[in-house]
Amino acid sequence: MSGNNENVSGITGHDAVSDDQYAYDSEVYDDQNAYQRQPADAYSNEEFLDQADYDSMYGEGYNGYDYPTGVTESYGDEYTPVDTASSGINQYSTEKGKFTRPSDEYESEYSDYNAQPSDANNFYNLRGDGRYNAYDPSSDSLANVYNSVPYGSSPYDFSNSSFVGNSGSGTPLDGDSGSFYADSANLTNREPYPAWTPENELPLTKEEIEDIFIDLTNKLGFQRDSMRNMYDFFMCLLDSRASRMTPDQALLTLHADYIGSDIANYKKWYFASQMDREDAVGLANVGIYGGKVTSIKEKGKFFSRNKKAPKVVKPPRKSRFKRKKKKEQPEEAEDEYIDVNTDDSLESAEYRWRSHMRSMTQFERAQQIALWLLLWGEANNVRFMPEVIAFLFKCAYDYIISPEAQNVTEPVPEGYYLDNIVSPLYQYMHDQQFEIINGKYVRRERPHDQLIGYDDINQLFWHAEGIARLIFEDGTRLIDIPASERFHRLPEVQWNRAFYKTYYESRSWFHLITNFNRIWVIHFGMFWYFTAFNSPTLYTKPFHQRDGPKPTGASQWAAVACTSVVSCIIMAAASLCEYLFVPRRFPGSKPIWKRLCIIVLIAIINLIPIVYIFGFSSKHQQRSGRRIAVGVVAFLMSIATYVYFSLVPLQSTFGKLSVKDSRKYLANKYFTSNFAPLKFDNQALSVIIWVCVFTCKFAESYFFLTLSIRDPIIVLSTMRPYLCSIYWAGSRLCFVQPRIILGIMYFTDLILFFLDTYLWYIIFNTIFSVLRSFVLGISILTPWRNIFSRMPQRIYGKILATNDMEIKYKPKILISQIWNAIVISMYREHLLSIDHVQRLLYHQVPAEEGRRTLRTPTFFVSQDDNIVHTTFFPANSEAERRLSFFAQSLATPIPEPVPVDNMPTFTVLIPHYAEKILLSLREIIREEDQLSRVTLLEYLKQLHPVEWDCFVKDTKILVEENAPYENDSVSEKEGTYKSKVDDLPFYCIGFKSAMPEYTLRTRIWASLRSQTLYRTISGFMNYSRAIKLLYRVENPEIVQMFGGNTDRLERELDRMARRKFKLVVSMQRYAKFTKEEYENAEFLLRAYPDLQIAYLDEDPPEEEGAEPQLFAALIDGHSEIMENERRRPKYRIRLSGNPILGDGKSDNQNMSLPFYRGEYIQLIDANQDNYLEECLKIRSVLAEFEEMETDNVNPYSESARERNKHPVAILGAREYIFSENIGILGDVAAGKEQTFGTLFSRTLAQIGGKLHYGHPDFLNGIFMTTRGGVSKAQKGLHVNEDIYAGMNAMLRGGRIKHCEYFQCGKGRDLGFGSILNFNTKVGTGMGEQMLSREYYYLGTQLQLDRFLSFYFAHPGFHLNNMFIMLSVQLFMVVLINLGAIYHVVTVCYYNGNQKLSYDTSIVPRGCYQLGPVLSWLKRCVISIFIVFWISFIPLTVHELIERGVWRATKRFFKQIGSFSPLFEVFTCQVYSQAITSDLAYGGARYIGTGRGFATARLPFSILYSRFAVPSIYIGARFLMMLLFGTMTVWVAHLIYWWVSIMALCVAPFLFNPHQFDWNDFFVDYREFIRWLSRGNSRSHANSWIGYCRLTRTRITGYKRRVLGQPSDKISMDTPRAKFTNVFFSDVLIPALLAAGAIIPYFFINSQPGNPMFITDPNNPSPYVHDTKTGTNPILRLVIISLIPIAAGFGMSGFFGGMACCLGPAFGLCCKKFPSIFAAIAHTIQIFIFIAIFEVCWFLDGWSLPKTVLAFCAVTAIHRFIFKILTLLCLSREVKQDSANISWWSGKWYGKGYGYHAFTLPAREFVCKAIELNLFATDFFLGHLLLFFMLPVICIPYIDRWHSVLLFWLRPSRQIRPPIFSTKQNRLRKRIVRRYSALYFSILVIFLILIIVPLAAGAEIRQGLTASEAVAKGAVGWNQTNSSIGSGIIQPRDTNYTANYSFWYDRYHFEFNTTY
């Protein structure tokens, strides 16, 4: 520590050891003596307390956890009026501010550590936790409790303060009075900015800086509160920088970061927009359009894409700049800013810029920073647009330095800047999203590609051409008027004529083609190489299998060389798609047609030799050497083309994006491709990883995938089914069936080819991450001795900054203070018992000569792991985990910490909306609802039994101490007080007395173990405690200076902590909190007075009908409480309007951003936690930003240019998911977060692929705020707001690092529904990211290795899930097509180990060689199986290196035993569905994912309605296909599919708590029946009809207004999807899937090999040309498909008409008439479905496989037809459910439909026809799912074992059964009896409908045998049907190919299935 008093004076901060979080005795409730107690006798013994290990130098009052909080006085002089009585002398200085070293005696005393135990016994006075304040919102005593805290007059009353004055006027800061500066005797000590004091040779005093702010405010019209806020913001920055460098250097570097250096965003914009040319000669003189803009009349749609730009008159393009050689430049050019005659090169311009920056005075630098901050601080939503702020800064500064501004005498009105500059821009952005209808705002249904968003507005200012579009009403351009006039003319700019879309975020899959073109080139190209080489039959004509696959050499080379053409096609498609997304008029768009022409030319060049070989060469010529040489050349050219297109980014194809010294693409270079280069070793590692990935991937794919399809290609491409025919088609369809299968197999193999890459990426990422963990030394596999025994030395060397200590102490003394503070903090959190604490603490013990020495805990020297686990802390406890990680983390390389006084200031920012702040007593001791079986407190006690036991013991001690003062009755029971009976209330609910101070303790204990804001704040306030602890330990001399005045010592420590750390909670809804929420927030402010809350305040409108005024306000725990019981804001800054224009979170963060302080921001969610031992590392963490160097190098010097131009923008940190032990779902969610946030981030950060994920990440405040903030905020598009900060940082030149040694706690969703909601939000958010311009910039500009890292870490993960589900779908289509052949033909013998040849493969004769296809099918199953299971590798490996082999093995098998693979399958489908749905329909939004404990049983109907569309429907379709495949092509591999696909259907119910309880099951069944039937008489929120309507709205959309009224859910409007989007997902895909099911159905009914199809025995042909031959499956399929639909339309019309006739009359006497009518119609439709199923079975000859396949086809046809009807026939959905009720009631009048009354019935007619069919489907599917569960619910004690799997609770600690009243029990029993009878009745009917036909069909099929058929019909019996319907009934199943030998021997027919 330096000797200068400025570095040690004016300390602000908290004591790190002591805090209200851990001190029960120092609360706002001191008068109640709630926690003012001495330690219990059990641990107040001499060894523990009196033998404390701290010297008297810490003063009598030193108690690490005992200091007053919650009162104004404790806040220190910075926030309260100066107390003249305490001003006194400067404790730090004796003469002229110099520090006096202690005497030798003093030093000796401390060196020998000869302390008196009585001087320090308070440190171990283990008292209660300050977080357990006596507080209960539900208690009437709150008023008295609150009033116990003294609050004086408002410390923030600035009514008497002047903001206009000369230097020294002194703007009041944070409540200090104007006389603050007058106390010269105590100036340094009380200085709010200690590093910025006159003693430090300041370039500008704070009064001078203040005058700058006042002057700018007066001239530009800023708000006073905003000015004060920004002044404090600036001074905190200066104080932070000046604490580790000279003040002059601090101001200089700040100016460099904000304005002038190469890393400053403003400088980049200045040159990118050619403002240097504008300042020199004007843009009109350098080719930018000049003259006046002609008058424009707006036409067409509002801001339509086709709207033309303003026409301008262009003067002759003559540049006044002339090129000169550098040597001709005058040497004195440095002294001149710019000269029109100088060189126009970028290099010269930058040289002149640096010269000007060096020549600026510090006043000018401070003025520029102040101006930028004032503009930014009041910019509201414009803060998301950094280049707009840069432009405003340019305009404002041009005015400020003009003579006009210098002559201003009258100040501009306050709010001028907001009202005239910011508000018009805000209003434009607001109007883009909202329109006024009937006086209310309604959100526009405007897709992203028609909405001009933040980025479009911002990018207009990237280029001079965009700035030139800013015009006035008369057409004059802003840029053409003098620079000094522009700022005040900005209100006249016609903003709506300037902006246009700069990138079209069209909802299209084409984005993937452009953004990831290299992924497709790499994979498609290599797939073509492999597959073309192994598909000789496709280019060997004629091919004869008996000759084997012997293609000509030239043809094989040429076929493989087609890869280049494929690559060119992909590149051309990517370029054409880019043309769709990037408007040509945007100056930053690169020419596409030139690139496209070159691509076409390359394709033609590559195609010429291929065409020559295949088109102009015979087979004989293809074997010649010349043709082979041509083929080789074509192959070599294809490799060159393939490699080039794979390596080079799309934007850099055929030329770099920008050349040196070029001005045109500077904006693209600076803002979209300024990627930080990797260090050589990291770059090498990146390349090595991807070389390894693709080497293994290509090798494995070739040998495992490609070679396995080689034989299927040979047999299927040459296979000719013979004698097969169906009516109307003959042999046309069945003849090409093998080739159809081959095409689907090719596509499936291609998808698996993509999946393999991700598999190898996971493997190698894990391998390299593990290797790096060993390099860093963070693996637990390091010996125990190395981790724990060396921990004291590592604490001394890596936690403490001891190099600058003026007084040296023995390391043990310093270490003991840190270690004891950590242990005691865990004790206060009830993680350790007092016995554990005694074993872990350093103790003072007697030594020689009466001295005392410190005894090291045996914990550090223990050699036995078992002893450590059992002796020092509970086994597998939170304390063990935290201490283990702390020890491991210290073994890693950690930057050396700087002294506390020199560390930078930082802020923790926590956005909060409606998250739970503090649990109420009702919430923790009452069951959540009637579906829950356990209270929250009971569940927490089960999860944390040791911690609950510690808490109860602590509470009992507290009660015993307070008992004599509370009432005498307690003391009378002293003898029996500790009996088990008396202790029961403590162990039950944690308290015995209902006094607030006791109930609050229980509430806090529960809140600290749940996902609450209180847990987050209490955890991150540990930063304050850590700073105070470190400052005190490293600077023991300050204790001596204060003597025994502990209060002044505490205030000094508080000042230091407050100076270095701020915690801001952005409580958006604070002003509208409920009473309970407000009381909880007030409790937080009283418990943590330094906590700051930013919120939206509101003033009612001055006039009726006007909008209220909104303000961004800031309060803290020291703010005055006003008469309305609200706190007076410290700052209250008016806003342009409601800042929440997006999805909320990012707007909330942006609103509070001006209130952060310091250089760095840590973004935290409201469900996180932090720990004292982690907070002790904060100095090293901040040092990772690499800005701790204090060398005085001028950032504008030439030498500084060579330094790193890419600062660290984001520092990622580890997360510990503290919800991992909650059960299987919590563990799975935690595992994913741990692996993705830790294991992969470790490698990704090193190879440049990591982005920002919010949670614990630290951000470089200046870098991020000058580049758009900490997130993006366009609604829908930026729903995953935080990752855009990472992409923005990467694009703009920032580096993103990862910190291994620091971690925060994080909560995760715990219930099945909430986890899937989170996955849906992430999946839809990823869909939106695919559309974003950030993905376009990254995908088309990153170098290959970093692009691959980015792709596979982010979009690749989600696309991989999509590919997995697509491969499953394709597999099922292949399976049913293959099964259709297998079922009716004879399959040849096949030996997979033998080479396929004609002689060995066609056995028996006439057979079909399908063995290779079946072998390929098995390989596919194995591939998908491996891909699924590979997801467990990272978690297992992570657990292995973090916690050891045993725990990794245990966790793996616990997950497997708890069916987590089924959950993974379901999650994969949800991800896939989310991204595909979003790209088709949109609708991405923030989904609130509940953070409570999922202990309640959800009804079957809710789960079904929630997951039917994402998963259950597709699972049911797959199951039907799989059932058919199992009956026809059975292999053992299909078992895997049965398990996986069943997971898609049953996973929601399998992971539903208590799903299999017998009584609950049937009560739930009743609810399902009611769910199906309700909602037809009156609207019901939870009904089948409501679910059905909601499902189709994603296609139809909602009517935006009904009867002229605004939408009732403005923010939740679902826009109608575009037809082009829906066509692909809802028309084309269902049509293809329908074809995939129809074609095999036709083949299975084509009777292949039937000799009756031979028309001419003398000249038999395998091909049947007669289209009237065979049965008629086409008509059969049409009948069984259309009858239910026709019946639906018929009943819809009949019942609709009957309702109109009977409804009005019957409705008078029977209110349930509509429901009854609907139930009758639905029941009839159910019976129609049953009849159709039985008829289909009959028509298919009682063949169950054919019937199942028929229903696969029918289901696909119905899906396709209903999609078409919905898309073409249904208009928008009415929000209210009145149309449905009107249909069934017949009451269309009086409903207020207006003219819709004529169209709604027609629409509803179509709806009801569709709904009747969908109802029957849901009825059968729901019952089938319930029937599947019957065997499970019959298992004894199944509910108990099921709960063990879900919650991981032992059977002995199971959640109790629910308790019902007698009446409820009777009712439940009656329900169970009735509905179990209904359930089993329907089950019996289902079984009868299946078993009876199955048995009857078996009898019927025993009729005619094959031999009888031969005897009956000789050859020539042609089965020709004369009538259409004669072939509708399919004959019984007969394998005619089995009789091939008979026909061959008897009639000498020979039909081969192969060529």
Curated annotation (Swiss-Prot):
- In which residue ranges is the amino acid composition biased (Polar residues)? 1-10
Which GO CC annotations does the UniProt entry carry? 1,3-beta-D-glucan synthase complex; cell cortex of growing cell tip; cell division site; cell tip; cleavage furrow; cytoplasm; division septum; Golgi apparatus
Membrane topology type: Multi-pass membrane protein
Q: Enumerate composition-biased segments (Basic and acidic residues).
A: 95-104
> In which residue ranges is the amino acid composition biased (Basic residues)?
308-327
* Remarks, miscellaneous: May synthesize a form of 1,3-beta-glucan not stained by Calcofluor White.
The protein depicted here goes by the name 1,3-beta-glucan synthase component bgs4
Gene that encodes the chain: bgs4
